[in-house]
């Protein structure tokens, strides 16, 4: 144990010297999430009537109660949440409704489709739905190879089937959860400079 402690101390000292850069990870998380949330929110706001119909219709939509309110909350949370993430303002607070939005999306929209966003029968996370998609994809390829410009169609990437599982929603939730605990990050966020100005949270690694 003494040898382990002796070896640990200098290594920990090196890590402590790197603490000045501990705001980099929160910054990159924010820059990754901000355009995703902004785009999702803007799509809902710019097609608000269609969004409300999808939220409320029980046959081909989500069948949620109070669809106007739910659509407005989801769209506003994503769009304005994306703006706050971008500038690093109230990041820990806005992470909460954004996480709730991701949970609602995962449970009400994506859960029945399993984990995978893109159907990949070779994945060990593939469910029965994904395995069945392999035959559909093979038939689609055969039709396009026989009757379409297959080389041109696949010139920018392979044909895939969207499975629409919880993969993206769960990933965004984990990233937001990290921001909830770490904050917006040192030096590159409005939160950090507000904390310094007010004397609140200045002793934490990330504001």
Kindly label every feature range from the protein language model.
Residues 1-49, 65-76, 80, 87-207:
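Extended, low-polarity transmembrane helix blocks
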Residues 52-66:
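Perimembrane loop-to-helix junctions flanking transmembrane segments
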